Amino acid sequence: MKALEEKYLEGLSELFPSIAAASTEIINLQAIVNLPKGTEHFLTDIHGEYEAFAHVLKNGSGSVKRKVDDVFANTMSSRDKQTLATLIYYPREKMERIREEEQNMDDWYKIMLYRLIEVAKRSASKYTRSKVRKALPKDFAYVIEELITEKSGMTDKESYYNSIISTIIQIGRAEEFIVALCELIQRLVVDHLHIVGDIYDRGPGPHLIMDKLMEYHSVDIQWGNHDILWMGAAAGQKCCIANVIRICARYGNLDILEDGYGINLLPLATFAWKQYAKDPCECFLLKEQDNCKPQELELNMKMHKAISVIQFKVEGQAAELYPEFGFQRRNFLDKINYEEGTITIGGKIYQLLDDYFPTIDPKNPYQLSAEEEEIMNRLVKAFQSCEKLQRHMRFLLNKGSLYKIYNSNLLYHGCVPLNDDGSLRKVKIYGKSYQGRTLYDVMESYVRKGFFAVDPDEKKKGRDLMWYIWQGANSPLFGKDKMATFERYFLAEKELWKEKKNAYYLLLEDENVMNGILDEFGLDREISHIINGHVPVKTKNGENPVKCGGKVLVIDGGFSKAYQKETGIAGYTLIYNSYGLILAAHDPFESTEAAIEKERDIHSDSVIVKRTLERKTVGDTDVGKVLKERIADLEALLDAYRSGQIIEKV
């Protein structure tokens, strides 16, 4: 036995000091390895739509309903099954309404408790008792474990269960117990959650989504371009801060910053109202303005314009600082004829839709005015010192990454930058060229430096690279030749708005190219999949989210209402359970109120993308590999005990 191996086994013998102890652990671990794999739930592109996100989280993209159907099959009507599912999603709210209608609540409690116990029992069946025990609510842990655990050898099980349930009702704890069971079922039907990018964007509730995710039992996040933008803003990067505020203003969601995060926008509002007092700001209409009062709308439009002009200025400064980012070609303020109200692009002269720029000095167009400089400095301080925002960003850093390899699948938001021939594109980052997986690793390293580096130069590079990742032509999270923000505001010619996508998006059906990406990330091309967020799938035009014969799954979550008109549906989510991969296409979510009152679930059409020939077990997963290594180590310890190389400590 080699010295290092012997030293390791000696250490292991401290934990398992006898043949009996090591043998028991092997049996326990082997039992776990043989259990069915837990259900993974993939969501992408939530875009701040909290209500729809919360509902999909509660129903597990149909996993809860499937579990109810499995348990009650033909023994319950469809309506009763839907009522039970709604109760599981919204136990407190549903019971409030039931109390108004039901004559005999004790009977109702008894029926529902029995039904919920059966669903909980089925949901817990694929886990070890230890894992289920950890998921149990403290107040009812012992009782729930008694009710959902099979008791062989008990002669009068029914009487035993009846007595427990009767006591729960009698002492007035039925409703709390029902809530506990419902939340347990929600937790058990999904073992692990993957968020494949873009928690943030145009919707009103990204801060609420972050709060929800921080409470979730098991989650990982692959950063989207909007997530990186907020991370850059939280790190104090001025271009990112201006973009974040502009997008919130554009969609009428400045409340996210003011109420959600407590960031003071009053200096910006005062400045905008003064500078653009007589300007109608018609190019800066809000995308969502139905709920705005006229005066509030007017102020928002002025703030929208003020921060947009500031954004173009600070981006112009940053573009000069980092010419390798390729943003100098996106500088437009120096190409404007301020007397004529025109701009020269590509040798052509275009009329601007808005030519009122009171804060721009034509001789030095990218210089902030004294007031703009003060506003930006205050905003940098506000973003960096906002405790809640920093807490949310730390969570994104702790649970997130640019890509994730999980159970032989490759998860990322956006694209792997490619050349037109499908080869990996080399991208220059601070003087060095990178491609493929190395590009992701280097970029992620700089993102973390933007928060944690001790060297101020490295920290600044990290912050500024987040701005590039947000909208750079060769950024894996963006993947277009430009972000046509300026053109969309100021130019009527729609041909100037076009954003050319990276070749990756044209090559999604090319098996050689997709296999090359899997090879690059060290995955088995025969069994692995690429799970890709970011791009809305236009189902109404016949587009399919399943690409390359099932090797690539493009699952934009479609939570953003703006995209639902383009796609025809409310996006896709993915379930990967022990039977295979299930893709769910969702209809738009009406509202939480309708889900409770009218029992309107999100209607989902599920398609089995891949059914496994044999049911997948824990042994087939990443956790299973670790457990098998542990078993092999324990077997080596047993051999050492039996051969006398290591003495039992008994």
Describe each region flagged by the PLM:
Residues 1-650:
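Feature recognizes metal-dependent phosphohydrolase scaffolds
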